[in-house]
Amino acid sequence: MIEQGRSSQDLKWLENYFKEGGNKMAETYINELKSKLDARKKEILSQLNEEYNKILKSRFEDLESVKRNILKEVQNI
């Protein structure tokens, strides 16, 4: 609580002090949040890339199987 008898200049200084401190705290919070979101984004992209590679490999294996079957059929003709 602010004591009576403080000058308006002192009150203004105190107000600015808390305002600047609040901005720094907000910046720190935002930077920490951004860092966590960037890490999560990297993790999600890695998982998506891994899943994409699995699907791609599976499709390639399917195509190879079809190719082998067609070659067998052609040889039997």
Curated annotation (Swiss-Prot):
Q: What is its EC number?
A: 7.1.2.2
Question: Where, by residue number, does the polypeptide cross the bilayer?
Answer: none
Q: Give the UniProt keywords, A-Z.
A: ATP-binding, Hydrogen ion transport, Ion transport, Nucleotide-binding, Translocase, Transport
EC top class, as a word:
translocase
Under the cellular component aspect of Gene Ontology, which terms does the record hold? proton-transporting two-sector ATPase complex, catalytic domain
> GO molecular-function annotation terms?
ATP binding; ATPase-coupled transmembrane transporter activity
Q: Is Thylakoid one of the keywords?
A: no
Q: Which reaction does it catalyse?
A: ATP + H2O + 4 H(+)(in) = ADP + phosphate + 5 H(+)(out)
What InterPro entries does UniProt report for this protein, alphabetically? ATPase_A1-cplx_e-su
Task: Kindly state a single biological-process term from the GO annotations of this entry.
Answer: proton motive force-driven ATP synthesis
Family in the record: To E.hirae NtpH.
Assembly and oligomerization: Sul-ATPase is composed of six (or maybe five) subunits: alpha, beta, delta, gamma, C (proteolipid), and possibly epsilon.
Q: What is this protein called?
A: Membrane-associated ATPase epsilon chain
Give the gene name: atpE
